[in-house]
Amino acid sequence: MKTLSHSDLLQRMEEAVARAVTFPVWPTGEAPGAAVSPVTFHLEENHTGPSAFDRSVTGVRGAQITVYAPEKPNGVGILVTPGGSYRRVVLDKEGSALAPFFNARGYTLFVMTYRMPGDGHAEGADAPLADVQRAMRLLRARANEWHLDAKKLGVMGFSAGGHVAASLGTRYDEAVYTAIDDADNQSARPAFMALVYTVITMHKEIDHPGSRHELIGDTPTAEQIHHYSLEERVSADTPPTFLLHAVDDPAVKVENSVVMFSALRKLGVPVEMHLFEQGQHGFGIRDALGLPVAVWPELMMEWIGTKV
């Protein structure tokens, strides 16, 4: 990975996207709670400069999953929740760019879009959690379609999308939507969590202001802060967790990963954390090239292999 050029990565991303298949998380396309939301879906494409092929979406009304399937599945699936400050979802930097590396090792990736907490959905701040719970249950129900073991489905999240993933790992059994079909009889608990430069806490000392604003507003109650500070929602049943962060992250402070590590360790949850001196925020795959942090996919895949 260290010697992969940006142009090679772009080519592999485009090939992965061309092969991918997308389907809705909710049966009618739109989420049940979207009926009261005024937002309109918008896809923004950026195909210029060094950040070429960097799509993002806003105004999501119904979550979708894009499947990046390997030639030889190893039975493990990963539901991916990309970041975007709880304002948008980036599709490539923390989505399609992962496919060449994880598919090569047999991992099937399911990159999802999800609704924003500030877009006026009936579930409010829990709209993203409703989407990711439903997504995990749907993947379990359909695991055979992709030659997967339903017990080996985990979640990987980045930045604000990491908060979505960590919400799934700590709040998987909370009823945030009404069951609509047999898929909802499945467990939403992921087999493992992989959290990359993740927003964890809502406490002001180390929070990410943009994500906090979108999730709980500017004047949250103490209960709201506790409810969405995921280091305070950890239990002994929280899945094994992999944490990755750059110490020089100027947006989401590295202390987010540190407090999550401490909370997991205190309750005996298996946890591994990798901190790198350099990387800034949002390095994903592309911006990690040429830095020591570029080894992170290999580290993560080796760790996953010990947990499933």
Which residues fall in each region the model found?
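N-terminal cap/lid segment of alpha/beta-hydrolase-fold proteins
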Residues: 4-73
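Mobile cap/lid helix-loop segments that gate and shape the active-site cleft of serine hydrolases
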Residues: 43-52, 198-233, 239
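Short beta-strand element of the alpha/beta-hydrolase
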Residues: 75-83
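Catalytic nucleophile-loop/oxyanion-hole region of alpha/beta-hydrolase
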Residues: 89-91, 95-98, 112-150, 289-294
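Primarily recognizes the serine-hydrolase "nucleophile elbow" in alpha/beta-hydrolase
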Residues: 134-207, 225, 295
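Acidic catalytic loop of the alpha/beta-hydrolase fold
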Residues: 202, 248-252
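Short beta-strand/loop motif that positions the catalytic acidic residue
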Residues: 237, 243-245, 249
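C-terminal catalytic histidine-bearing segment of alpha/beta-hydrolase fold enzymes
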Residues: 244, 254, 258-308
